[in-house]
Amino acid sequence: MEISNSLEKDFGKKFVLSHKTIEKYFNHSGSLPYVARYRNEIIGYIIGIPLEYLDREPWTRIEKNFGKHNTIYTYAFVVLEEFRKNGYARMLKKVYLSKLEKLNNILYNSGHVRKGISSKFKGKIEVINHIDNWQGTGKTFEYYRREL
C-alpha cells in the first residue's frame, strides 16, 4: 500500500490503494498480481484483472471485447519513483506480459495510460479512446488495447 502513495503526487488521493482494494485485486481469483523487489523491499507492482471485473465502469461499453473473457485489463502499474528509469518497470511489465501470452483464451491486454504513453509500447497497440480529466486527475488519458 505504501507504494501506491507515490500515485497521489501525480494523480490525487483516490489513486492510493486502500486495504480493501488490495484485498479485492491482489487476492481475487483471476487476478494477476506481480510484485517487484529490490533487496527484499517491494519497489513496485502490476495488477491485471479480467476486463469483466469492471462491469460497473461506464467506459467498458466502448470495449468490443467486454463479455468475451479474452482481455486482461492492467488495473495498476506502479514503481517507486527512485527506482524508475532503471529498467525495473520494464522487467516487471515483461514478466507480466509473458504470463498473459501463455494464458489460454487471453488475446488482449488493455489499460488506461497518460496520453502518448502507449505510443512507446512495443507490439500491436490500438488506442481506442481519449478521456480528458480521467478520474478527476485533470490529465488526458488514453484507453489502449494490445494484441498478445
Each model region followed by its residue ranges:
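Conserved catalytic-core motifs of GNAT/GCN5-like acyltransferases
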Residues: 110-113, 123-142
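Conserved acyl-donor/pantetheine-binding loop and adjacent beta-alpha core of acyl/acetyltransferases
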Residues: 46-76
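Short, P/G- and charge-enriched loop/turn segments at secondary-structure junctions
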Residues: 21-23, 59-65, 128-132
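Membrane-topology and secretion signals of cell-surface/extracellular proteins
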Residues: 52, 75, 95-96, 122
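Conserved GNAT acetyl-CoA-binding A-motif
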Residues: 100-115
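Conserved acetyl-CoA-binding loop-helix of GNAT-fold acetyltransferases
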Residues: 76-79, 85-98
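Short amphipathic alpha-helix that is part of the acyltransferase structural core
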Residues: 1-21, 28-43
